[in-house]
Swiss-Prot record:
Accessory subunit of the mitochondrial membrane respiratory chain NADH dehydrogenase (Complex I), that is believed not to be involved in catalysis. Complex I functions in the transfer of electrons from NADH to the respiratory chain. The immediate electron acceptor for the enzyme is believed to be ubiquinone. Involved in osmotic and oxidative resistance, yeast to hypha transition and the ability to damage and invade oral epithelial cells. It is found in: Mitochondrion inner membrane. Pfam families: ETC_C1_NDUFA5 (PF04716). Coiled coil: none annotated. This is NADH dehydrogenase [ubiquinone] 1 alpha subcomplex subunit MCI4. One of its GO terms (cellular component) is mitochondrial inner membrane. Disruption phenotype: Increases the sensitivity to the oxidative stress agent H(2)O(2), as well as to osmotic stress agents sorbitol and KCl. Impairs the yeast to hypha transition. Causes significantly more damage to the host macrophages and causes significantly less damage to host oral epithelial cells. Keywords: Electron transport, Membrane, Mitochondrion, Mitochondrion inner membrane, Respiratory chain, Transport, Virulence. GO terms for biological process: respiratory electron transport chain. Induction: Expression is repressed by CAP2/HAP43. Expression is up-regulated by H(2)O(2) in a HOG1-dependent fashion. It is a peripheral membrane protein. The gene is MCI4. It comes from the Eukaryota. Belongs to the complex I NDUFA5 subunit family.
Length: 139
């Protein structure tokens, strides 16, 4: 499993393990993915960090921010309301809880990258008029 550097720097949690670190040698049945020792707090932290990143780095009218906030808030609500990991997996529908942790870490990483690139701004160079014409149809 991957490590998320930002989670190593969160002082308030006092967890002995990195939140996205795999358990030691307990397989999930998927190649390269091991059981997470405590997935619920990891997901709550990842989702809260993603929401914080979106609010700090994206304008309110950004389509990416709106859609990602809606998805993240929905998943956060599910994780906070359910204690049983199997119920969380079924309600989210993203596979095993370890896969959901990986997805959440990837979404946080993507939000940080897109925020730095300011993808909501206009292009510096306007595209040519025929740039998006394929097979005689303008897209």
């Amino acid at each position: 499993m991957r490590f998320t550097p930002i989670l190593r720097q969160i002082p308030k949690l006092k967890l002995s393990e990195v939140l996205v670190k795999a358990g030691d040698g307990v397989p999930t049945g998927l190649a390269g993915i091991y059981k997470h020792p405590n997935p619920r707090p990891a997901l709550v932290t990842l989702y809260n960090e993603t929401l914080k990143t979106l609010k700090e780095n994206f304008p309110a009218d950004s389509v990416y921010r709106q859609s990602t906030e809606a998805l993240t808030q929905n998943r956060l609500m599910i994780v906070e309301s359910e204690e049983i990991v199997e119920n969380i997996e079924n309600q989210i529908g993203g596979g095993l809880i370890e896969e959901i942790v990986i997805q959440a870490a990837d979404e946080l990483s993507l939000a940080s990258q897109l925020g730095g690139l300011k993808v909501w701004e206009e292009l510096e160079e306007k595209p040519l008029d025929d740039q998006w014409v394929y097979f005689g149809k303008k897209i």
